[in-house]
Curated annotation (Swiss-Prot):
Pfam families: ArgJ. Its main location: cytoplasm. The active site is at 180 (nucleophile). Heterotetramer of two alpha and two beta chains. This is Arginine biosynthesis bifunctional protein ArgJ 2. The lineage of its organism: Bacteria, Bacillati, Actinomycetota, Actinomycetes, Kitasatosporales. GO terms for molecular function: glutamate N-acetyltransferase activity; L-glutamate N-acetyltransferase activity. It is found in: Cytoplasm. It catalyses: N(2)-acetyl-L-ornithine + L-glutamate = N-acetyl-L-glutamate + L-ornithine; L-glutamate + acetyl-CoA = N-acetyl-L-glutamate + CoA + H(+). Substrate binds at residues 167, 180. Keywords: Acyltransferase, Amino-acid biosynthesis, Arginine biosynthesis, Autocatalytic cleavage, Cytoplasm, Multifunctional enzyme, Transferase.
Length: 391
């Protein structure tokens, strides 16, 4: 059966005058209280939306989420916090629930408050119950860019449906000066709040913590899942697998749509002491200028990439350095092949395609640590992303 939309969810999306003339506000709500799991930015400069949403998920139950695209409302002091709280209060009135059961997320330039007169007028004109579940419209509003392809994925797990919408760094409004990552999943599967939170944290660690776009965390990074249980129980192992695959698909989508140009770069690190070490190495390599030089250089040199991998291994006391090998497209490129006359494997990848780099750290003994990071090769478009005001 084709996945459509999970039962018991309603959606509103529209233009609230936040920025531009396109849809820039979305509300996703469950007809009944839903279990919720969420992860947020690790930045100490978290936006008010993150602070309020952390409070909302503390009891493991939520009714909905509101997303404002085009304004991060971060670095705006007490008044910015009050604005975000008012938005949450207005949405709670529409959904007919306690305001602490509403998550809020924002994305866009930092240092500006919401245009509250316009946002307030828009929300006061919305009447509950909300209409049908137009998740494609919600995805477009979350993205907040006219004419862009919404990032949305659907899947099935037994009788339950899962749906996810997302935006990544550089896929948002304000001329791509936005570094936030937002992702929201809804399902009608029945999963307890504690179990759902555990599952989602593992999924987020594998998917969103494997999203390589620089070391700096955004002020508003938010990923959440709501499960309202209307489809009944599901096999939890299968559910985690389906949710994990859905999240990884979204990560790859937002990387491709990031606006930085070039190829999707997937770095798979194996042979590490543990998953933490593998993830640390993978993220460092994806962000390294040496990787981009190797991908695009006329005479690719993978030794600097190996140096980055080795330098972030952090062997520690009692840990022995391994023998690092690097393969691109299945061909070993480090240590350097003897036949340098042969074209490097990476030249087989067209621009806009996908480059897969496999780094084995070669830690002696049993080394089960492995992690995969997705990023892009950051061509000329990327400096424009960092030149804006949003983070």
């Amino acid at each position: 059966m084709r996945a459509s939309s999970p039962r018991g969810f309603r959606v509103h999306h529209g233009h609230a005058g936040i920025r531009g003339s396109h849809a820039d506000l979305a509300v996703i709500a469950s007809d009944v209280p839903a279990a919720v799991g969420a992860v947020f930015t690790r930045s100490r400069f978290a936006a008010p939306s993150v602070l309020l949403s952390r409070d909302a998920v503390a009891d493991g139950i939520a009714r909905g989420v509101v997303v404002l695209s085009g304004n991060a409302n971060a670095g705006t002091g007490p008044r910015g916090y009050e604005d975000a709280a008012e938005v949450r209060h207005l949405v709670a009135g529409i959904v007919d629930c306690d305001e602490r059961d509403v998550l809020i997320a924002s994305t866009g330039p930092v240092g500006e408050r919401y245009p509250m007169s316009r946002v307030r007028a828009h929300l006061r004109a919305v009447r509950g119950p909300l209409p049908g579940a137009d998740f494609d419209g919600a995805a477009a509003a979350v993205l907040g860019t006219a004419g862009a392809r919404p990032t949305i994925r659907r899947a099935r797990c037994g009788d339950a449906t899962l749906i996810g919408v997302a935006k990544g760094p550089g896929t948002g409004p304000a001329e791509q000066d936005d570094r936030s990552t937002l992702a929201f999943f809804c399902t009608d599967a029945q999963v307890s709040p504690v179990v759902l939170d555990d599952i989602f944290r593992r999924v987020a660690d594998r998917a969103f913590h494997g999203l390589g776009f620089g070391a700096d965390a955004s002020t508003g990074d938010t990923a959440a899942v709501l499960a309202n249980g209307l489809a009944g129980r599901v096999d939890l192992v299968a559910f985690e697998q389906v949710l994990g695959a859905l999240a990884l698909d979204l990560v790859r989508d937002v990387v491709r749509d990031s606006g930085c140009g070039g190829a999707l770069v997937t770095v798979r690190v194996t042979g590490a002491h543990d998953t933490e070490q593998a993830g640390r190495v993978g993220r460092a390599v994806v962000d390294a200028p040496s990787l981009r030089a190797a991908v695009h250089g006329p005479a690719p040199d993978w030794a600097p990439v190996a140096a980055v991998a080795g330098g972030h291994g952090d062997e520690g006391p009692g840990r022995s350095p391994g023998r690092i090998t690097i393969r691109v497209g299945g061909r070993e490129v480090f240590p350097a092949p003897r036949d340098r006359a042969r074209p490097d494997a990476v030249t087989a990848y067209p621009h806009g395609g996908e480059v897969t780099v496999h780094i084995d750290l070669g830690v002696p003994g049993r080394a089960p640590g492995a992690f995969t990071v997705h990023g892009c090769d950051l061509l000329a478009g990327y400096p424009r992303l960092g030149a804006g005001r949003a983070v």
